[in-house]
Amino acid sequence: MVHAIFCAHGQLAGAMLDSVCMVYGEVNVSAVAFVPGENAADIAINLEKLVSAHTDEEWVIAVDLQCGSPWNAAAGLAMRHPQIRVISGLSLPLALELVDNQHTLSADDLCQHLQAIASQCCVVWQQPETVEEEF
């Protein structure tokens, strides 16, 4: 099983976890918020506390956007802990897919899967074409 952390700006990570729990019930995911007044070092400390409980196991840290403070903190942690993977683009469809597969895929396979399906997580509704019937 891959352990997972949602980490994002503001209260997004906690709200994402709440939303995932509405769908699946209790899940093996933690949330780390990045709030005003904090920096990447503060986030890294919070992430390290979670990861330190299972340092020999695989982790995926899903962040909201690449190159933001959550990404920088998670990537810095991943550089020191080779069992950690970091993926950006946290959204509810991606979060649900992560939880769906964290028990069956390795961290590498899980990240590859999430990256492969990412474009399916954003769909534009289009007005159906109307066809006039001929009588």
Curated annotation (Swiss-Prot):
Main location: cytoplasm
Modified-residue entries (Phosphohistidine), positions: 9
Pfam family, one: EIIA-man
Entry keywords, A to Z: Cytoplasm, Kinase, Phosphoprotein, Phosphotransferase system, Sugar transport, Transferase, Transport
Inducing or repressing factors: By L-sorbose.
Cellular localization per UniProt: Cytoplasm
Ranges where the PTS EIIA type-4 domain occurs: 1-131
PANTHER family in the cross-refs: PTS PERMEASE-RELATED-RELATED (PTHR33799), PTS SYSTEM MANNOSE-SPECIFIC EIIAB COMPONENT-RELATED (PTHR33799:SF1)
Organism of this sequence: Klebsiella pneumoniae
Domain notes from UniProt: The EIIA type-4 domain is phosphorylated by phospho-HPr on a histidyl residue. Then, it transfers the phosphoryl group to the EIIB type-4 domain.
Protein name: PTS system sorbose-specific EIIA component
Gene name linked to the record: sorF
